Amino acid sequence: MKTLYRDNKGLHRWLFACGAVLVLFYLFRGNRAAVNFWVYSVTLPFEQFLGRACAALPFSVAELLYVLAAVTAVVLLVLMVHYLIKSRQKGRAAYRCALFVLDLFLTVCAAFSLLWGANYYADDFCDRSGLSPEPVAYDDLVRVTQYFADHLAEASMHIARDENGLFTADRQEILNYADTVYDCLYDEFPFLDMPDQKPKGIFFSKIMSAMNFTGFYFPFTGESNVNMDSPAMLLASTCAHELSHQRGITSEQQSNFLAVLACTRCDNANYNYAGWMLGYIHLGNALYRVDPDAWQQIRDSLPDEIVLDLRYNSAYWAQYKGLTATVTQSLNDKMIKSYGDELGTQSYGAVVDLLVNYYA
């Protein structure tokens, strides 16, 4: 046993170092003051620095790292298989390979916990703003859903449509506007004020669609990344959602709420439409679950072109329903819950409580 440890001393020290970081993380995660200092004075400024550095490049560094990681994984697998075949002491060789893989995995876990996981235990948007997702009354839900439907119809009059009647816009122009979309919220929520880095479009966006993702924030580069293949009508609200993560906000319900608020208040027609659309979709889904007739009445009041956009969006995502999307969303749900967010991916729907309480 001593020989086994001595022969792999570096790998064992690496393992203990990662383990120590994770233990310290779980010990201190309940100390709100310490976590707030770590998030808002250390990691958030560091991620903003990374984001500014990566912003100079015209492509997503996060996507490049994912591709390099996949290629590296294949190369390492081949090398380890070759090493195991050639080794005379296959048990020791297998142990060394397993230890190396474990070290890599724990390194990623430790780094992710420090850069992003800590945010789940810091003061969130609701803590800092005083807003709270309290349970909502039925009448308020109906009224706010109708309010969003009316404003969605108004916003629809100011956007462009293609020959099929669907929403159309230059996707790059939507991305270019994103770094100003939060300007309208700084007076009400001054703690949100920070320089934004424009979201990056993902080249392999169809893979994101297969995984049922419209966007993601990558803390290792400070970049917000968005799906450029999914329906354009919600691209603007996706950009706003991902930019909320640049501010250290982890809760998906709070990020969606901020996306709706920022998009509907800014002076860009495409963002206005996406914001009212995102809010209506969440509110409409909630209303449908409690009163399908009330939902149908509001749905029938929408202009035909909006219904066309909604149907196109549903049809697009329907083609990607399958094992890949199910597994990916399940893993994402478990990851979010592992950091104390009991709603997991369902927190995307809890945005309804915030919207109704705010607009009622």
Residue ranges and their predicted role:
Residues 5-19, 96-101:
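Alpha-helical transmembrane segments and their helix-start/interface "positive-inside/aromatic belt" motifs
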Residues 20-83:
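Membrane-embedded alpha-helical segments of integral membrane proteins
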Residues 58, 235-256, 260-261:
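Active-site recognition of the HExxH zinc-binding catalytic motif
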Residues 74-78, 92-126:
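Transmembrane alpha-helices and immediately adjacent membrane-cytoplasm interface residues
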Residues 117-187:
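Membrane-interface segments at or immediately adjacent to transmembrane helices
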Residues 139-143, 148, 250-294:
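Post-HExxH zinc-binding segment in Zn-dependent metallohydrolases
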Residues 160-228, 232:
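Auxiliary, metal-adjacent structural segments of Zn-dependent hydrolase domains
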Residues 305-360:
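Pan-zinc metallopeptidase signature
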